[in-house]
Structure formats: C-alpha cells, structure tokens
C-alpha cells in the first residue's frame, strides 16, 4: 500500500472522534463584497501543509511572512490585518494537501484566494508527488480559478501539491508580490487504495471477516463529508481470462459498496459508481508475484456529489 495511503489511514483512525464531530458539506467562501466561490467538499478542501516558502526580493514586511496564514480555510479580514502571506517580488510558495487531493473533473478544479487591493500575476504549477511539476497557466487581475482541462490534464491523476510563483507585477510596498490567503480544491477528492488480499480470499468476492475493520476505517474518512459520490474501482492481475477478471472485479466492487452503504447509512447522502477494470489498469507489470499483488486492489475515490456537477451543466 502506498505510503501516502497508509499515512492518511493512520490519521483517520487516530482522530475518528474529531472527524465525526466536524462533519461538513459544501460551503460558499467569500471572495469579495459581491462574490463567493463554492467548494462542494467544504472545509477539508484546502491546502494544509507548507512545503517551501522562498521570499522574493524585495521581501515583504516581516509581519506579512507568516506562512501559517495561507493554510486551511481563508480568513482574510482587511489589508491591514496580516492574516495572509505575501510572496515578495518573484517569491514562491509550495503547499500540500495532506488529507485530500484534487483532480481534473468537470468545471473549475482549483481556486487561489488572492487578497489585497492589487491582484498580482502568478504562475501556477501542480504535482502528484512534489517532484514532477505540471504548468497550469497564470492567474491575474482577480481571476483566480483554474480548470485543469484547459491544460489537457488527464482525468485519473490525483494531485497533492501546488506551487505558486509571483511574476513581479508589483515590487514595492509592505506586501510586495502576490498575497495569498488560502488555496482551495474545488474538485477535492479522497482516494484510497486497498490490497485485495486484505478484503478477499483468492479468487473470491465475499468479504473476509477482517475486511470490515479496514472498510470501517475508510468509512471514518468519509464521515467528514455528508454528501459525495464514491467511485469504487476493482482491479485484478492478469491470471485468468480478461472476461473472468472483469467479472470478479465487478463482484468485489459490489461487495464493498454493499458494506459501505450499511456503515454510511446514517451519516449522509451518497451515490455509488462501480467500475470493474479487471486486469486492464495495472500499476505494475504482471511479471512477478509481488507485482501481481500490487495489481490486485480495490480503489475508492470520494468526489463531489452528482448534483453539484449537474448544477454546472444547468449553468452552462
């Protein structure tokens, strides 16, 4: 199981009571006096960890360099209150989403909460691993939303990192460079991958007894969102025929969905989509026993609810 998945599961298990107490749904966030932006997954949708902050030159005043002020939900009050971070002229800011990610889905995917009277231009890059970066354009003049589809980003990759670079529009004043209050994922997602051996016996589609502990832990992560769509994807190795593997993965997905419907029944409103890939989306060559084990998995991706995307269609 990938390290990120283990880390997320650990956080969810040790903090289950807190998560349940903080159940949220979609929320409107104020942009200015007249406008808001809607984030369908609410307060979990924000970057919450500083990776790197390189102050530009000239640098902003020291009071405008508190890197914690760009994490979590936006809290901007006015320009005289330093509850945002200034990059300085040419400065860079790299942030991470640790308990969720974002991906290219319908509509805008990312929103940069830039504040202050003047809105500087910024270069935006995203990464799935914090190493390989993809350019996703620049924002300026108060236009702070990004649609990854405009940059031919695939629809499968979940991204966890955002890097912002000030483009040196304004290089004077106490808050020189772009001023960032928060970075939010409009199309926020939670993706978890589960080793099929943890859930099923070999070539079987009935959940083993211990599988329920794993799925209960995953349900805990979903408690913080009371309305969403769960995409459940089944994957196998290449042993057997393609038809057999697709059928097996479909049955396994159905078993997972049936159990999740029970444990989430009193929590909120959820839709479920089953996608049986069989052997068609391996993450490793099926040439060793270890690699085949990696390919035998069930993936659960929590995305915004269907009625959110339907509302985008109505607007268009």
Language-model features: locations:
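Periplasmic peptidoglycan-binding/tethering modules of Gram-negative envelope proteins
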Residues: 184-229, 265-266, 302-316
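A domain-level signal for the mature, folded cores of soluble proteins
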Residues: 22-126, 132-188
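Beta-strand signatures of extracellular beta-sandwich domains
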Residues: 123-125, 231-233, 273
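Periplasmic OmpA-like peptidoglycan-binding domain that tethers envelope proteins to the cell wall
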Residues: 236-316
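Bacterial Sec-dependent N-terminal signal peptides
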Residues: 1-23
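Extracellular/periplasmic catalytic domains that process cell-envelope and extracellular macromolecules
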Residues: 104, 155-157, 224, 266-267, ...
């Amino acid at each position: 199981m990938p390290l990120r998945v283990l880390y997320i599961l650990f956080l969810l298990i040790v903090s289950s009571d807190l998560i349940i107490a903080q159940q949220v749904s979609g929320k409107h966030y104020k942009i200015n006096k007249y406008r808001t932006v809607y984030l369908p997954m609410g307060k979990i949708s924000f970057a919450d960890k500083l990776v790197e902050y390189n102050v530009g030159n000239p640098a902003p005043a020291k009071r405008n360099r508190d890197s914690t002020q760009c994490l979590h939900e936006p809290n901007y009050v006015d320009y005289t209150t330093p509850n945002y971070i200034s990059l300085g002229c040419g400065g860079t800011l790299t942030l991470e989403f640790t308990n969720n990610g974002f991906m290219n889905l319908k509509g805008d995917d990312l929103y940069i909460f830039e504040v202050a009277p003047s809105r500087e231009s910024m270069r935006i890059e995203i990464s799935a691993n914090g190493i390989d970066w993809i350019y996703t354009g620049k924002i300026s003049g108060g236009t702070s939303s990004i649609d990854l589809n405009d940059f031919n980003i695939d629809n499968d990759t979940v991204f966890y990192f955002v890097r912002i670079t000030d483009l040196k529009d304004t290089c004077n004043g106490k808050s020189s460079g772009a001023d960032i209050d928060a970075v939010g994922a409009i199309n926020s997602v939670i993706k978890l991958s589960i080793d099929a051996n943890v859930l099923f016996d070999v070539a079987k589609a009935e959940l083993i007894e211990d599988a329920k502990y794993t799925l209960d832990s995953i349900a805990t992560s979903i408690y913080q969102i009371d309305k969403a769509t769960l995409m459940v994807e089944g994957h196998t190795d290449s042993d057997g025929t393609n038809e057999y593997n697709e059928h097996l993965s479909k049955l396994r997905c159905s078993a997972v969905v049936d159990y999740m419907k029970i444990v989430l029944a009193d929590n909120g409103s959820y839709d479920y989509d089953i996608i049986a890939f069989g052997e068609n989306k391996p993450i490793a060559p099926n040439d060793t026993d270890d690699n085949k084990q990696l390919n035998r998995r069930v993936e659960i991706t929590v995305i915004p609810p269907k009625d959110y995307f339907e509302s985008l269609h109505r607007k268009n």
